[in-house]
C-alpha cells in the first residue's frame, strides 16, 4: 500500500446523540476544519445516534419521501440529509459510527479506502474475516461495503474538505431489523412505483447483518469499541483523547452544513408532527 500515517491518531469518542441528527455530522465537520492547524494530527472519531435515517442525495428523488419520513417519525426515527454517501442508512443505538480524518488532501480516494479497510480488518479481526466489496441488495450498496459471510455489516464514504480528508463509516454491532426497516422505507417512499431512472436498486433485507448475528459472539457497543482500540493500537500509534473541538469551528460547521449545503435535519418528534413537510 502506498500510504501510511506517520503521526499518532487521536482516538476520540463523543458518545451517543439523541437530539438533532445533524449534530454528530457537525462535530465531524468541525474536526475536519481543525485539520488546517499546523499542529493538526489525524483523528478517529467515534459516535452513536439513536435513532434516525441518514439520507443520501439520491433519496431526494423518491416520489413519496415526505410521507415515508412522516411515518418513520411516528415510529421514532429522526432524519438528516448527509453530505457523503449515496443513499439512506439507518442508525440506532447498535450502530457504531467512525470518522477517520487526515490533515492531508493529496491522498488518493483508493489509497484512503484501502488504509481504512486495513484498520477495520485489524480492528474487527476478533469477530472474523471481513470481506470488502458491494453487497448487492443491501441498503446504500457500494464497492466500499464490508461484510461477514456475505452479509453487509457496514459501509464507507469519503470526501475532501479545504483542509483535509474525511472518511465516514458505520458498523452494525447488535442485531436489529435494519434491512426490514429499509425495505419498508423504500416501499413507503415509492421506489417500486418508479418505472425507470430508479435512484436506488431494490432492497433485500436478507443481505444485511450485524457482528452479533453473524459471529454468534456477544457484541455490545462498549465491547466493540474496546476491541477496536486495543487491536488497532497493536499496529498503529493511537492516543485516546477526550473529545474536543473548538466551539468556533462547531458554529462555523453548523452554518456550513445547514445554510451553505442545505442539509436538513429533524428529530422524530418533528417528523411526526401533523403539519411537518420537507423544505422546498
Curated annotation (Swiss-Prot):
The keyword Transferase applies. Pfam families: LplA-B_cat (PF21948). GO terms for biological process: lipoate biosynthetic process; protein modification process. Residues 38-240 form the BPL/LPL catalytic domain. Its EC number is 2.3.1.204. The keyword Hydrolase does not apply. Keywords: Acyltransferase, Transferase. The active site is at residue 140. The record marks 152 as: Lowers pKa of active site Cys. InterPro entries: aa-tRNA-synth_II/BPL/LPL, BPL_LPL_catalytic, LipL, Octanoyltrans_LipM/LipL. One of its GO terms (molecular function) is lipoyl(octanoyl) transferase activity. Belongs to the octanoyltransferase LipL family. This is Octanoyl-[GcvH]:protein N-octanoyltransferase.
